[in-house]
Amino acid sequence: MLHALLLTLSLSSQTAGPIDITEQELTQYVNQKAKYQQQYGLPGLFDVDLNIDAMQVRLGRQKANMAQVLSNGHFTLTLPGQPAVDGTITADFEAKPRYHLQNGAIYLDNFTLTSYQIKPATVQEQFAPLVGYLVQGLQSRLEQQPAYVLNTKDKEQLWLKQHVTRFELLPGKLRLHTDK
């Protein structure tokens, strides 16, 4: 709701020209719309229930034309013959933002894990094989589910969706251009 208001205010002051979507707006949208919860398991070997609780999107700060996605979550890991272990995971990813003209949506493609930390450290070794599944799951989710969508029920955003010609990634924001 707040991101729509901020974008509407931005559109009201600039009806023709570039419109910026900030990393704060992307972060808010991703946290509201792109919840990630997954269960993994191999019978007799392990079971894990993983939830990503919060993500933060940074745009063009570490690498040009790339987004950084910082995520925090929690998990429950169950191994045969051992009590279940609750823990936390912090994972950082790099992704390539893509603007889809027809949908008026921003997607995050080519997810790459750059670092992660598991607590308690005692389960790091058991959890390490699951990190690949985490990356694949998040990559699949965010390549299919937008990180941000223009609200076509709002007439200014509908106009913007119909007139965006290109986008560029700048430090801290995505700029949507309506020029030729």
Question: Which ranges hold each PLM region?
Answer:
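Sec-dependent signal peptide recognition
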Residues: 1-8
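Extracellular/lumenal and peripheral-membrane lipid-interaction modules
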Residues: 11-180
